């Protein structure tokens, strides 16, 4: 009788987990991505974008920045830190509305053994990682969690 109960419990657990995982939106979107594709495939990220309230003075500083900036964002669509902070980054770019600041997004797999091909030879240890380039030179990184806020950390890097 004991093994039968264990088997039923295990089957019940596996069925429940199997039903819940798709609801959580833990999809692996890999390689080059667009913001639009991320938000379409991970709709719960849209709520973070909508609710995030960036700091006004930092946004003003980003709006006024007058040199070309490229941000490479390495993210996992399955990763809670990516959901939180890449979504914040989306909102920051929206509000900064600076044509000189652009971003590219690279989706990284959950399986660490498969990640190196996506890192393009860059030293990426945690997700998300934002590599900030000004006029083609790397000026700094935001790794996993901003120190102050997404907008302030980005502005601090740009003003170095």
Where would I find each of the regions flagged by the language model?
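Bacterial N-terminal signal peptides that target proteins for export
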Residues: 1-11
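Bacterial N-terminal signal peptides
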Residues: 9-20
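N-terminal leader/targeting and pre-domain segments
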Residues: 25-66
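Conserved helix-turn-beta segment immediately C-terminal to the redox Cys motif
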Residues: 63-70, 88-106
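Thiol-based oxidoreductase modules, predominantly thioredoxin-like and allied folds used
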Residues: 73-77, 100-114
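Conserved redox-active cysteine motifs that mediate thiol-disulfide chemistry
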Residues: 77-85
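Non-catalytic, surface beta->alpha helical segment in thiol-disulfide oxidoreductase systems
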Residues: 126, 132-160
């Amino acid at each position: 009788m004991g093994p039968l109960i264990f088997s039923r419990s295990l089957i019940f657990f596996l069925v429940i987990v199997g039903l819940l995982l798709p609801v959580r939106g833990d999809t692996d979107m890999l390689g080059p991505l667009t913001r639009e594709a991320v938000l379409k495939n991970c709709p719960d990220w849209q709520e973070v974008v909508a609710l995030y309230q960036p700091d006004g003075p930092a946004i003003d500083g980003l709006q006024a920045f007058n040199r070309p900036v490229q941000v490479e964002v390495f993210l996992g669509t399955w990763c809670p830190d990516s959901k939180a902070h890449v979504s914040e980054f989306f909102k920051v770019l929206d509000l900064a509305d600076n044509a000189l600041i652009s971003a590219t997004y690279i989706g990284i797999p959950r399986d660490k053994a498969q990640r190196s091909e996506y890192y393009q030879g860059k030293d990426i240890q945690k997700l998300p990682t934002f590599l900030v380039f000004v006029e083609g030179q790397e000026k700094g990184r935001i790794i996993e969690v901003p120190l102050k806020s997404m907008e302030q950390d980005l502005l601090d890097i740009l003003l170095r």
